[in-house]
Regions:
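Flexible loop/turn segments at secondary-structure boundaries
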Residues: 2-3, 40, 69, 167-168
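Accessory alpha-helical/coil subdomains and C-terminal extensions
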Residues: 52-58, 80-174
């Protein structure tokens, strides 16, 4: 059975993948990705906490998101979601995807906007009272470990940033420029 990628009832995993692929090609930000994913998921956006309630949940988190915002890491399965179905609809429209995403996704988002489907759990919901989110590793700890390994190997290393964000093609171009400068 699916857990992490589990879509909301009415949306197939294939349709969820189509939306994810379309968002990727559109240049959507990670926050935009997460907003849409949370609203077509049965697990993300606080739903794991809601399903686990009233149990105590201890979530040990490895973050690959700059700044470690808990609602963005893995799309926040155990934290309140500040976004709405309306936000997800606006993101798809902003990127020109609303009319091209699967009909099942549009239907779920519209049903959510109308209140037919419940909104993701929000700040103040009792389901979060016994949830403990602990970041045990992130981009900074990984970057520092890599840097120390380089030094230990007797190589000259330079840690430029653990907080780099942007489109991979743009960041890659920047790193290539730095490498050419160092080599010159």
């Amino acid at each position: 059975r699916q857990l992490m990628p589990q879509p909301l009832s009415g949306v197939s995993l294939r349709d969820k993948r189509k939306v994810t692929d379309a968002l990727l090609k559109s240049g959507a930000t990670i926050n935009e990705f997460n907003t849409v994913r949370k609203h077509i998921s049965g697990f993300k956006g606080g739903w794991l906490a809601k399903k686990a309630y009233p149990a105590t949940v201890v979530n040990l988190i490895l973050s690959d998101v700059v700044g470690d915002p808990l609602d963005s890491i893995a799309s926040g399965p155990t934290v309140p979601d500040p976004t709405t179905f309306q936000d997800a609809i606006e993101i798809l429209k902003h990127h020109g995807l609303w009319n091209t995403v699967p009909a099942s996704v549009r239907r779920v988002l519209l049903d959510g906007k109308r209140g037919v489907i419940p909104e993701t759990p929000k700040l103040g919901d009792k389901v979060f009272e016994k949830v403990h989110n602990i970041v045990i590793g992130n981009t900074l700890t990984a970057s520092l470990a890599a840097y120390r390994s380089v030094q230990k190997a007797g190589l000259n290393g330079l840690l430029l940033s653990s907080r780099l964000e942007g489109q991979a093609r743009d960041v890659g171009t920047m790193f290539a420029s730095i490498a050419k400068e160092v080599a010159a």
